[in-house]
Amino acid sequence: MMRVSQLQLCRTSLSYRLRSGYHHHHHLHHSFFKLIKRNSILESPPTNASHQSPSPITPMVNARVMFFSTSTSAPHPEKINRTSSENILRMISSYLWMKDNPKLCFRVISAFACLVGAKFLNVQVPFLFKVAIDWLSSSSFVDSNPYLVAAFATPSSVLIGYGIARSGSSAFNELRTSVFSKVALRTIRTISRKVLSRLHDLDLRYHLNRDTGALNRIIDRGSRAINTILSAMVFNIMPTILEISMVSCILAYKFGAVYALITCLSVGSYIAFTLAMTQWRIKIRKAMNEAENDASTRAIDSLINYETVKYFNNEDYEARKYDQLHENYEDAALQSRKSFALLNFGQSFIFSTALSTAMVLCSQGIMNGQMTVGDLVMVNGLLFQLSLPLYFLGVVYSDTVQGLVDMKSMFKFLEERSDIGDKDIDRKLPPLVLKGGSISFENVHFSYLPERKILDGISFEVPAGKSVAIVGSSGSGKSTILRMIFRFFDVDSGNVKIDGQDIKEVRLESLRSSIGVVPQDTVLFNDTIFHNIHYGNLSATEEEVYNAARRAAIHDTIMKFPDKYSTAVGERGLMLSGGEKQRVALARAFLKSPAILLCDEATSALDSKTEAEIMKTLRSLASNRTCIFIAHRLTTAMQCDEILVMEKGKVVEKGTHEVLLGKSGRYAKLWTQQNSKLEV
């Protein structure tokens, strides 16, 4: 495979980052932590939320979405409604109970049936143990319990039943996990798809103003939060509530209200203490996470700038700075461990006090002849069974609180509305009816920021099947014109029409399906060459993909690769040279076969030889199509039917190459400047 040199890689990557606003540092930082995250799916009980697996869609949003060159855009006011925790839980419940999917509803019912079955058998374990002990320790047991004797016959049978109850409870728990996992994973899948679809529905203005790192964190944390909350609800909160209720009722029925009161008071104290301590520990944990992030960021930044560190012999300096930040993490982590020890001691003290009180009452009952040794064992067993779910209460509470916060951010994001292509409005519009593909701008005004006008009342027309080149200095509004046609932005005033139809009054999908784009920086998917070409028309056959590659003059090059069309192009296509990537973009355009072609300085970053080859292919692609070329090199512009010269958002000259040279105006000056550079 033809590989670009290290210098070409750096230049290509730098060009992409400068034009698209791609944050290389954040990307590496994010990727680093992706590697060290543990993969996990719905577990029981849940661990800390930070260790659960992220949504499959998060890598997809790790780069800022851009089109052509970057321009500063006006802040987009967020149109969001306040999302309460109750509404979030209600929304999750709606995904859990999908009325249109009876199989999933049956799984939900089955999971709750397994939950009840597990807890019912769980409370039988201490009871059966009590029966066995009383039977073995009291000679009067057989006479006073004829029904139990008839049911079990021997103490060994009771102990076998004890084992069956324990195993059955465990089996129901595992069956509940197995049955409910399908529901939980489908819920996560449904919401993840909705998030990705929402990302693509939002307009470019939103993406230009949204911090990529913040957006990525919202999606990542929100998807993990779904897993956390579902785990907490199904595997911790609901089972614990059910078990506390059952234990309290059994104790009240068998031994009196005082035992139920002890249970309720101890559980209430335990929960209150745990929640108060957890609130304090959340603050400590937050400080620890921040310190850890600072240290990790410093280490990664140092490694990213490895060569710079070596140039100035600053290895010791970097190590000291990292050590200072890691010391902050060490202090915070130590504080966290101390608070955790205090939490454990407090929980143990409350539980031990309640258990001791109950045991003292039981011993008095035994001394008075009102209770048996088996009763003491039963009370002890019932109370101990509450200790495990209560032990995880702090983790569950902190994860649930954080999960609700993260989900609020994600659901607010889902409530964002797009200024362009709102589906409710768009589906009511008629499709674009092509009659040749003529394009007209009628007194168009546009600005990204109120104080900076980009297009200032421009008007021009591109006849169907003709080609127009737009030239001018940087910032004159050339690429913005292409954005207007593709309707990434709407005009502030004026009209953009295709075949006499205002593009705001036609269905967005039909508009964009009629337009092909060849950008300056072709960013490819990290997939095969075949996939990247096929992406231009997903309904195309293999032979049509090969024909498109031949027309783009890249088929022979691909066939020389060891894996041919199955060759992976690498992240953003960096395994291919600039010319090869442009040919892939051209092959996509051939495959799409649009009526209108937009090219944004498609050859400006290429050498002269590659430019000539690409231009030859472009002329073939542009044949009998309405084409607009944003041209940096005027050798591209001179071959078009008409040239528009732009300055400060206005068309200052227009005509053919020869006519504009004859005017000795702005175009002639640009031509002279470029030729002078070539001569030098």
Curated annotation (Swiss-Prot):
- Phenotypic effect of disruption: No visible phenotype.
Instruction: Write out the transmembrane intervals.
Output: 109-129, 145-165, 232-252, 255-275, 340-360, 376-396
Under what conditions is it induced?
A: In leaves after iron deprivation.
Q: List the membrane topology term(s).
A: Multi-pass membrane protein
Q: Does the keyword Transmembrane helix apply?
A: yes
Q: Where is the ABC transmembrane type-1 domain?
A: 108-402
* Domain ABC transporter as annotated: residue spans: 439-673
Task: Using the UniProt entry, state which stretch of residues is the transit peptide.
Answer: 1-75
Binding-site list for ATP: Y448, G472, S473, S474, G475, S476, G477, K478, S479, T480, I481, L482, R483
Question: Which Gene3D superfamilies does the record match to this protein?
Answer: ABC transporter type 1, transmembrane domain (1.20.1560.10), P-loop containing nucleotide triphosphate hydrolases (3.40.50.300)
Q: Which GO terms describe its biological process?
A: intracellular iron ion homeostasis; iron ion transport; response to cadmium ion
The UniProt keywords, alphabetically, are: ATP-binding, Ion transport, Iron, Iron transport, Membrane, Mitochondrion, Mitochondrion inner membrane, Nucleotide-binding, Transit peptide, Transmembrane, Transmembrane helix, Transport
Q: List cellular component terms (GO).
A: mitochondrial inner membrane; mitochondrion
Q: Which PROSITE patterns match?
A: ABC_TM1F, ABC_TRANSPORTER_1, ABC_TRANSPORTER_2
**Any idea which GO molecular function terms this record carries?**
ABC-type transporter activity; ATP binding; ATP hydrolysis activity
The subcellular location is:
Mitochondrion inner membrane
**Tissues showing expression:** Mostly expressed at low levels in roots and flowers.
Keyword Mitochondrion on this protein?
yes
A Pfam family annotated for this UniProt entry: ABC_membrane
Q: Which CDD domains match?
A: ABC_6TM_ATM1_ABCB7, ABCC_ATM1_transporter
Q: What does this protein do?
A: Performs an essential function in the generation of cytoplasmic iron-sulfur proteins by mediating export of Fe/S cluster precursors synthesized by NFS1 and other mitochondrial proteins. Not involved in the export of cyclic pyranopterin monophosphate (cPMP) from mitochondria to the cytosol.
Which family is this protein grouped under?
A: Belongs to the ABC transporter superfamily. ABCB family. Heavy Metal importer (TC 3.A.1.210) subfamily.
Q: What is this protein called?
A: ABC transporter B family member 24, mitochondrial
Q: Which gene encodes it?
A: ABCB24
